[in-house]
């Protein structure tokens, strides 16, 4: 019997319906040279032969040392984490709507919420969002719903916000009447000049978005921007790397009254790099805004016998209860990734997280300092950073990155795609996984490549 599920008549009907002339046309976005017509495997080989062949081919892969960052980070993941996550109780668990049958999963989410609220200094956390960009978009929608005093649906955003986050934000809010104004960054320090905010003082904003560390790795003037936003009646949305909060003050301490909503990408905490996902976004907020928070929230309660238990709470916010009035059409969470993050934070504890963050900063500082000793290479901005820093090169950065790949090093993130004035700049990121020997190899490879391409 055939294991192909669709008959030719069904395929033709499908193509006619969507207006495609052939199945190949469905995949014409994929360049021809990337498509494989055959797998180059002999017919009739047995499983042992096939396994040996795949091993030989896999050995042709090589793993560069990664210094890219820019929103997804290489951190050490203790072996115990994914060994636990892969257990059937977590790996195959379904939505925990039936609380009496889902106490283990619900408790994990509750512990995650508790730790994220503690890390960010906020009162409440949801069970996670799809990713950092989605979490920001939902935070903006949440802020507009919450800020009843705002006379507009305008949001003020610093130019140093991650460009991918901005694109997702614009896509999700495109047809919702929300407008964005952008504050240009200071070319000398790579962050928002607080004095420039006065140019926007006559506009009413529902929210102000502050990313710190920002896309260029710099620490924003969070106190000044937060106070300015609150003075002008806007809620403050903090976008941050959760790992940085182990050594930096929490968003709850920004300015006189702290941020109102905190969000970001949770991938650094126990989730491996995987071509863009699956990752998870986190969102926390002050209690005043919790009823406008999207996604799931797990609460702690007691049963009829007085025993402690956990359940999904405040569900009237969600679209499976009140679709027309829901806070979001997100009615899920990244449960498996959250489980990994919960175990990661539990295993490392506060001291472990602080150690990881400190070593990451120190390694980035060392790498940047050593690079700046090379003729023609310099640190771009004169302000504080966490674990990413922009480096100016005497050659085209994209060419430099390509040549460094030949030295088995992913040298950094090419910034010219988003900032034309940074065509000769890369952003480098180091974490606790990079050794002093790795950094020495990077420096020597840089000298070698610059000599080769004329730097």
Curated annotation (Swiss-Prot):
Family: Belongs to the GcvP family. N-terminal subunit subfamily.
GO biological process: glycine decarboxylation via glycine cleavage system; nucleoside metabolic process
Protein's UniProt name: Probable glycine dehydrogenase (decarboxylating) subunit 1
Native source species: Francisella tularensis subsp. tularensis (strain SCHU S4 / Schu 4)
Subunit structure: The glycine cleavage system is composed of four proteins: P, T, L and H. In this organism, the P 'protein' is a heterodimer of two subunits.
Catalytic activity: N(6)-[(R)-lipoyl]-L-lysyl-[glycine-cleavage complex H protein] + glycine + H(+) = N(6)-[(R)-S(8)-aminomethyldihydrolipoyl]-L-lysyl-[glycine-cleavage complex H protein] + CO2
InterPro entries with a match to the protein in the record: GcvPA (IPR023010), GDC-P_N (IPR049315), GDC_P (IPR020581), PyrdxlP-dep_Trfase (IPR015424), PyrdxlP-dep_Trfase_major (IPR015421), PyrdxlP-dep_Trfase_small (IPR015422)
Keyword Transmembrane helix recorded: no
Stated role: The glycine cleavage system catalyzes the degradation of glycine. The P protein binds the alpha-amino group of glycine through its pyridoxal phosphate cofactor; CO(2) is released and the remaining methylamine moiety is then transferred to the lipoamide cofactor of the H protein.
Enzyme class: oxidoreductase
Swiss-Prot/TrEMBL keywords: Oxidoreductase
Record PANTHER family: GLYCINE CLEAVAGE SYSTEM P-PROTEIN, GLYCINE DEHYDROGENASE (DECARBOXYLATING)
Entry's transmembrane regions: none
Keyword Oxidoreductase assigned: yes
One Gene Ontology term of the molecular function aspect: glycine dehydrogenase (decarboxylating) activity
E.C. number: 1.4.4.2
